[in-house]
Amino acid sequence: MEKVIKQIVTINLEAGKANPAKVGKDLAPTGINLLGFCNQYNEMTKLQLGLVVPAKITIYEDRSFNVKLKTPPAAFLLKKYAGVEKGAAQPGKEVVGSITTQQLRTIAEIKLPDLNTTSIDRAMKIIAGTARNMGINIEDD
């Protein structure tokens, strides 16, 4: 018998650091086992420590769940590679950092599975647009 989906929840958590206190406000109303989710998430993300890894949780009527990991947010990766804490308050007028085209390609390769394209060049353009909106310049190698 097919399980009936009750709800789908997406949350952003730091890899390997999920605990019931952090996920409680988002997942407690769904009725799933919070400790079970945290243990499963931490096990799945133990090789990605230090990154923010979004999780898409499909919750079924019987309170069981399925976890699917996504790639880290583009903004998080751009800030990490540019070495900045946050994006520009006034993008276009203010520059907070810069990345090389090789770093842009690396970020695009990481994000490619979650983007609506299969071309690395188009993925680079998508990530470059995000960088521009954050006040991060892209410099040629």
Curated annotation (Swiss-Prot):
One or more lysine residues are methylated. One of its GO terms (biological process) is translation. The keyword rRNA-binding applies. Keywords: Methylation, Ribonucleoprotein, Ribosomal protein, RNA-binding, rRNA-binding. One of its GO terms (cellular component) is large ribosomal subunit. GO terms for molecular function: large ribosomal subunit rRNA binding; structural constituent of ribosome. InterPro entries: Ribosomal_uL11, Ribosomal_uL11_bac-typ, Ribosomal_uL11_C, Ribosomal_uL11_C_sf, Ribosomal_uL11_CS, Ribosomal_uL11_N, Ribosomal_uL11_N_sf. Belongs to the universal ribosomal protein uL11 family. Part of the ribosomal stalk of the 50S ribosomal subunit. Interacts with L10 and the large rRNA to form the base of the stalk. L10 forms an elongated spine to which L12 dimers bind in a sequential fashion forming a multimeric L10(L12)X complex. NCBIfam families: L11_bact. Forms part of the ribosomal stalk which helps the ribosome interact with GTP-bound translation factors. This is Large ribosomal subunit protein uL11B. It comes from Halalkalibacterium halodurans (strain ATCC BAA-125 / DSM 18197 / FERM 7344 / JCM 9153 / C-125) (Bacillus halodurans). The gene is rplK2.
